[in-house]
């Protein structure tokens, strides 16, 4: 049997056992109050290891809907020949201006282990402030239909002071 485990910071936990010769279709993973949960993890967890991933997959799936993950929506680990069909990723929109920092800043997309190929599209940011971040806004992957408006930032203690 294969176990599918959902666990969100000790508030939600579910385990599903699936016979090894059966396929799993139609999983929906959603967080009940996405803004509250996302903001909690964004403000209180400084490293990525403390934020939950909506679902981690170690075998093939189809017809997945993933909603409002505080970190990654989908992670593939220790897989060969993974095939994903009919995936939908839904997310909420933060209505208020975003303040980010201190830290790395905001990264759109991730190259992943071994610089695997990744593409990101349809990201629109309007109104963000970056305080004491190393990078501000950045992307390490191919992006399409991405806009940043009204984004600004400053350092209270510059990381790389000007040369004298």
From Swiss-Prot:
GO terms for biological process: carbohydrate metabolic process; cell wall organization. Its EC number is 3.2.1.15. GO terms for cellular component: extracellular region. Signal peptide: none annotated. It comes from the Eukaryota. Keywords: Allergen, Cell wall, Cell wall biogenesis/degradation, Glycosidase, Hydrolase, Secreted. It is an enzyme of class 3 (hydrolase). Pfam families: Glyco_hydro_28. GO terms for molecular function: polygalacturonase activity. Its main location: secreted. It is found in: Secreted, Cell wall. PROSITE patterns: POLYGALACTURONASE. It catalyses: (1,4-alpha-D-galacturonosyl)n+m + H2O = (1,4-alpha-D-galacturonosyl)n + (1,4-alpha-D-galacturonosyl)m. Belongs to the glycosyl hydrolase 28 family. This is Polygalacturonase.
